[in-house]
Structures are given as C-alpha cells and as structure tokens.
Regions:
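Single-residue recognition of alpha-helix capping/boundary positions
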Residues: 180, 234, 263-266
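Structural signature of tandem-repeat unit edges
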Residues: 8-21, 31-43, 53-65, 75-87, ...
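Short, aromatic- and cysteine-enriched interfacial helices/patches
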Residues: 212-213, 268
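Consensus positions within tandem repeat domains that build extended binding/scaffold surfaces
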Residues: 1-6, 23-28, 45-50, 67-72, ...
C-alpha cells in the first residue's frame, strides 16, 4: 500500500516474488536499499522509489507504466529492465545521474521532465515513441545522439542544455515546440524527413499543421553542409516557424528562397555559406 516502507533507511534488500502492484511512495526515502526483487509487479505508483540513493539495479520487466517521480534522485541507479513499459511518467528518472543508457522498446510517450538532469545518460533507445514531453531530456549533458523514428511531437525545451548532442533523427516529426534544442551547442546533424547523411538537413514539405517553435536552434552556429531537400516551395509553405527558429543556421544551398513568413535573427555569414534570411 501507500507509504508502506517510506523512509525505512535501514532496509537493504526486498524480495517480493508474488506481489503484482506497488503503491505510491511505498519505498520512498529508503536510502539503504540496494537490492530489490519484484518479478511479478505490473503496476508501480507515484514516487515509489524516490530518493533510494543506494539502489543500483531493478527488474521491472512486467511493468507497463512508470508513474510520476518513480525514480527521482535514485542517484546510484545504473541498470533497469523496462522491456514492457509503454508510458514513462513525469519526472520518472529526474536526477538519476548514474544512469548511462536505457532501452525502452515499447514506450510510446515520455512524460514531462522524465529524464531531466540525467547527466550520465549517453544513449537511449525509443523505437516506438511518439511524443516527447516538455523538458524530458533537459540537461542530459552527456547525451550524444538519439534516434526517434516515430516521434511526431517534441515539447518545449525537450533537449535544452544537451551540449554533447551531435545528431538527431526525426523522420516523422510534425511539431517541435519552443526552445526544444536550445543550448545544444554540439548539434551538427538534424534529419527531419527522408534519408540523411552526416551534416545533413532535410525539411519536409510543410503545411499549416507543421510547427517549429521559437529559438529551437539559435544558441550556436549550426552548419548544414549536405542540404538536399530545401526548395522555395518547402520554405514558403512553412508558416508556423517561431521567432529566431533559424538564428545561427547556415547552409550551402545556392538558390534564393524567400522566408517572408518567418522572423530570422540577423547574422554574419562564414565563407562559402549562405545565411537563411527573411527576404
């Protein structure tokens, strides 16, 4: 039940082979807990293991949904099996600084701030994910690359401060909210549609349902050196681009597209590049 073992700081291990459900905050604050066996659990509540700073691994292979704040501040957690999970709740892994990689093969939705400040996270596999919540990966400073082949929506500030993020693959995306990639100073490759190569950038043929929020790529210069799908028609149809969406972005396209519907920050061009402009 709720708060069943809350703040039992002397508890070091748990073996519950027949339990199928764990209530909210059941083991929250059990700072001495290092080992836990819950092989039959299918449902886990909110903040269930919050603050279990000694926990290093856990098998939740039968769980389908991870509640809000389940692993907040589990700073020693390095290994977790969530092979059947389809939903990751808000703040689920907030500040799990030791977590370096996680495989979520069935997950379709990542909640708000789900992996915020997971500073050790270098890779994540989300082959079925459709939605990425606001600030889901904010300040994941070690995250280098991520493939999101089915994602259609990316929330506000989803990847803010991911300074090592070098490439991202988003072939199905239709809506990228404000500040989604703000502070991604290492970003070199973005694929939004079609097939791309390193240092490539592809834009879908936009309509009024396609949105790019303000300041998505504005913090640092992003060089798009392999542009193969940038046409006048594609650009002029993209009417939902936010303010400064294309600030600091350069490309080697030789046409003269019009961006009359966009607001672009004034910049100085490097040699051999053309600045995306508003005229």
């Amino acid at each position: 039940g709720y708060n069943a073992f809350n703040k039992c700081t002397g508890l070091t291990s748990i073996d519950l082979p027949k339990v199928t459900e764990i209530g909210n905050r059941a083991f929250a604050g059990c700072t001495g807990l290092t080992s836990i066996n819950l092989p039959q659990v299918t449902k886990i509540g909110y903040n269930t293991l919050q603050g279990c700073t000694g926990l290093t691994s856990i098998d939740l292979s039968q769980v389908t949904k991870i509640g809000n704040g389940t692993f907040v501040n589990c700073t020693s957690l390095t290994n977790i099996d969530l092979s059947q999970a389809t939903d990751i709740g808000e703040n689920a892994f907030w500040n799990c600084t030791a977590l370096t990689s996680i495989d979520l093969p069935q997950v379709t939705d990542i909640g708000v701030s789900a992996f915020w400040s997971c500073t050790g996270l270098t890779s994540i596999d989300l082959p079925q994910a459709i939605g990425i919540g606001e600030r889901a990966f904010q300040d994941c400073t070690a995250l280098a690359s991520i493939d999101l082949p089915k994602v259609t929506n990316i929330g506000i500030g989803a990847f803010v401060g991911c300074g090592k993020l070098a490439s991202i693959y988003l072939p199905q995306v239709t809506d990228i909210r404000e500040d989604a990639f703000f502070g991604c100073t290492g970003l070199k490759s973005i694929v939004l549609s079609g097939t791309g190569t390193e240092n490539s950038f592809a834009l879908p043929t936009c309509d009024t349902t396609y949105g790019l929020g303000s300041q998505n790529f504005s913090p640092e210069n992003l060089f798009l050196t392999g542009v193969t799908e940038l046409t006048d028609e594609q650009i002029t149809q993209c009417r939902n681009w936010g303010n400064k969406t294309w600030a600091n972005i350069y490309y080697n396209y030789k046409g003269s597209p019009s961006l009359a519907e966009a607001t672009i920050e004034e910049l100085t061009n490097p040699d051999n590049y053309t600045k995306v402009t508003d005229k």
